[in-house]
Amino acid sequence: MAFSGPEMSDYENVVALNKAWLDLLQRESRLSSGLTGLPDGLRLRLTNLSKQQIGRLAATPLLLFSFREGDDRYWTQVLAGGPERDLFMTSAADDVDTLIAASLGFIWQLARRNPYALRLICGASVYWTERIAEQTFFQLLDAFRSTGDTPSARFVLQRDLWRKLLSSGVSREGVSRNAAQVSALQSVLTDPPDNRAENWSLAARVVSAPQFSVAEEKQPGNR
């Protein structure tokens, strides 16, 4: 049985959201708590990327940040509900709020449209995907906003992977970047955050997804 993988437009949205998150990491202290767990050196590297490096790293074909998709206990509490607030009575959203709304909107519609693709893009469990799909978008957004939390870096406990992403993953050499990005994708597929024995690894092997590649950047002169 073949599963429908992410469409090219899904990958384009992933790249755009990754870029927005990486851009904000360079200047928004609100997101710094999401780097907890990374060594100081990696946090310093991640928050001091050049524009070119951000563009290269953002091309990783999965969300580099997480809403704790594998933490069922956390999301059970988040979705348990409380008094509903009027989303339109709050002050103007800042850039971090905009990132949260855009990211959750993308995740929510994908959970309803193609949950298998969501497994590839953010390692979401079946349980989490089903719970998210049951909500309206505004219910989901309001529930997460009520926690006061912000997205966190994915793979915070996989320090070697982040070292690879922040070295080879931002390299000018397309082959090196591609290898680092594939390593990240493999990690999402083989190391689910809650270590459940689900059938997602089988789905990943037979999924039909657009092919992507990383082209070599043109080098100025002989440098």
Roles of regions detected by a PLM:
Residues 1-80, 205, 213-214, 220:
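Structure-specific DNA junction-binding interface
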Residues 60-82, 146-190:
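Long, compositionally biased
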Residues 84-102, 151-162:
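Membrane-interacting alpha-helical segments
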Residues 165-223:
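Short, functional C-terminal segments
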